[in-house]
């Protein structure tokens, strides 16, 4: 997996980020990790001090900007957006990478196919996601079941 970078936006994630990094470490995933942190988030920066992560101080603002900065900084063949809050399960990274190596530009994970699931989905978020997913299928001809879930892996050049 040394051809994979996890891009991890982390704003005020000092509590959850160490748990996420431990989970990744326990799976012996040999991948690069870029953690994008705003300079004013001193607590998250502190928990990263002795980690094996590359720390990228975010120049702009917001989640989308953190993704752009992290993905533009990635140099491996593949990159994966990986949340710092523990909402993604790293055990699926090998399967996702295999699909990318089977010549898919992007692999999107989903909460709505077995054995997936979401503990924090309400009826309203489920309906909203269903609506937006349907809209994206119609407008962009996407074969996707969960457009609002950002556990995405792809060729770094395609992201950039």
Say what each PLM segment does.
Residues 3-5, 32:
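Cell-envelope/extracellular polymer assembly enzymes that use nucleotide-activated donors
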Residues 8-21, 39:
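Active-site beta-to-alpha loop of glycosyltransferases that engages the nucleotide-sugar donor
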Residues 17, 24, 70, 85, ...:
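Residue-level signature of catalytic and energy-coupling elements of molecular machines
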Residues 22-31:
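Short, acidic, metal-binding catalytic loop of nucleotide-sugar glycosyltransferases
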Residues 29, 50-52:
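Short, structured coil segments at secondary-structure junctions
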Residues 37-45:
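A conserved acidic beta->alpha catalytic loop
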Residues 59-61, 65-72, 78, 90-160:
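Acceptor/aglycone-binding surface of glycosyltransferases and processive sugar-polymer synthases
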Residues 77-87:
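Short beta-strand-to-loop acidic/aromatic patch adjacent to the donor-nucleotide binding site
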């Amino acid at each position: 997996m040394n051809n994979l970078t996890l891009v991890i936006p982390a704003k005020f994630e000092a509590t959850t980020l160490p748990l996420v990094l431990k989970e990744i470490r326990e799976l012996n995933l040999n991948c690069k990790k870029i953690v994008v942190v705003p300079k004013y988030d001193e607590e998250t920066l502190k928990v990263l001090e002795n980690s094996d992560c590359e720390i990228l101080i975010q120049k702009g603002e917001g989640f989308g900007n953190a993704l752009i900065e992290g993905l533009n900084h990635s140099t491996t063949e593949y990159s994966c957006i990986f949340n710092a809050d523990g909402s993604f399960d790293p055990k699926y990274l090998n399967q996702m990478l295999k699909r990318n190596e089977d010549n898919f530009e992007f692999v999107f994970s989903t909460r709505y196919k077995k054995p997936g699931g979401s503990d924090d989905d309400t009826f309203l978020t489920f309906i909203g996601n269903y609506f937006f997913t349907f809209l994206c299928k119609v407008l962009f001809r996407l074969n996707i079941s969960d457009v609002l879930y950002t556990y995405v892996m792809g060729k770094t050049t395609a992201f950039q």
